[in-house]
Amino acid sequence: MRAHVLLASTLTLAACNGSTSPGPDASGPPHDANVDAYRPPLPDSGPGSGVVVAGCRILPQDNPWNQDVSALPLHPRHAQIMANISPTTHLHADWGAWTDGYGIPWSSGSGAPNAHMDFVDYPDESDMRPCDGVPFCYPIPSTARIEGGPASNPGDGDRHLLYLDTTGAPNDCTLYEMWNTNGFTAGTWSASNGAIFHLGSNALRTESWTSADAAGLPIMPGLVRYDEVMAGEIRHAVRFTLQHAFNHHIHPATHDGPSSTADMPLYGLRFRLRADFDMHAMDPHTQTILRAMQRYGLFFADQGSNWYITGDSDDRWNDGDLIGTINGDFRNVTGGDFEILDTGSQI
């Protein structure tokens, strides 16, 4: 959830909250030849391999999402900002089973035909990809999953749609993300907006533009994904939400929040779990997530509940009540256990 501040722009990318049409049925991954991987393979582990999902490298290794921040200095306003972001609130794992409607699902595949896009709220901040005389055509199959689970309806929550086009794998895949997705009818997807991320590039969105996330960031690179946790290593920063956002931002974010109150957190602000945080008594899967927070940190990406960590939508999170175990451990991790990092000047 987020409060959107729409800034005027002359270009075209995409934006924010969530609305529309029921996703595929709950019987499992949609049966579509164009959707070939709802669950990624175990990530590569070789040196310099970067993050690999469904055969695609998720952004270059030197991208901010993949940056080791364990040695970065603290933000000069660390104490003042921390006082405004509920430092006594514990973390919450905001993900879980697809059939229960938890987490943000993603789909992947190649060869899907172009579908027309009807961006009803923010077409001026949505990425153009013209075909058939219309400005927006994305190769997203009709069976791509929508956030909220198989029983969700338009207007229920944020209804993000994330589609990884594996054409060009491993180094030149394309990520399509939409917010407030109403559904697919007669060859057309309807959503509030759409963003395209070329995963072989470190290019940022147009300055002042939002995306499917309020900050103008991609969502998929920051998800806690089931397969990574089970493999015992997450090699990227993690997405999370806070209640308030300042009306400036810091790269790689490109969009401002609505608050003019001094020392509120900015979109794109980077956080890091303290190196001396004691996690030895926690479940090994929880430790995998927390170690990533120490090495790669977290990005503040959207307004929502304080200290909600975002993960993927996968029924396997319910195996042995894994998500319950992680959330039990997260009750012993609070906002005050994190450090705010100095990654550049606000814009």
Language-model regions: role of each:
Residues L42-I347:
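Short, surface-exposed polybasic-aromatic patches that bind anionic ligands, especially phosphate groups
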